Amino acid sequence: MCIRDSFHPEHGEWGFAGYVQHYVDKPTIAAVNGTALGGGTELALASDLVVAEERTKFGLPEVKRGLIAAAGGVFRIVDHLPRKVAMELLFTGEPMSSADALKWGLINQVVPDGTVVDAALALAARITCNAPLAVWASKRVANGVDDGVITGDEVGWSRTMREIGGVMRSEDAKEGPRAFAEKREPVWQAK
């Protein structure tokens, strides 16, 4: 994923890719190249617009490691894709090509490899020629923003935090990364 600044310039305390959990008033465009699994897909889901290269793969493979996509991926993917498609991605952890992501509406454009930054900047130029206050207001209304918070996301974050606690304390959460590091298939215990 190509990110000019990987943090909000006015909120360095949010850390790398911190805008997944915070509302940004200006339009955000993800320029994605290569593999965007886990956090890369979660950044794309948190962005207003997404431009991806032909070779790009999207996915939330956390379940393959005994984890869940805790940076908004689980509750956002069902808003971006048809429910059955989203559930397949969540349950299998398998990746989706940029062509399929475009077909299902997860992204806005697929561009030739090596051109994603230029394409994202061209899209930004089409936005910046419009009245900023109207663009920002349109974003707030479309996202259901009240007092700088996307109100629908609050419930999703609450559920995610509640579930991640139990998952992270599980034996499976230890086994998944261990098996990955040892280059073997995990032995799940459901505990």
Explain the meaning of each model-derived region:
Residues 1-2, 48:
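Beta-strand-loop-alpha-helix segment that lines the small-molecule cofactor/substrate pocket
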Residues 4-33, 65, 154, 158, ...:
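An acidic, glycine-rich surface segment that forms the CoA-thioester-binding/catalytic face
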Residues 15-25, 31, 37-91, 104, ...:
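CoA-thioester-processing core
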Residues 51-56, 98, 107-158, 171, ...:
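C-terminal long alpha-helix characteristic of the crotonase
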Residues 89, 141, 145, 162-168:
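Helix-loop "lid/cap" segments that line or gate small-molecule binding pockets
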Residues 169-173, 179:
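Interdomain hinge/lid region at the active-site interface
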Residues 178-191:
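Terminal low-complexity tails and localization/encapsulation signals of metabolic enzymes
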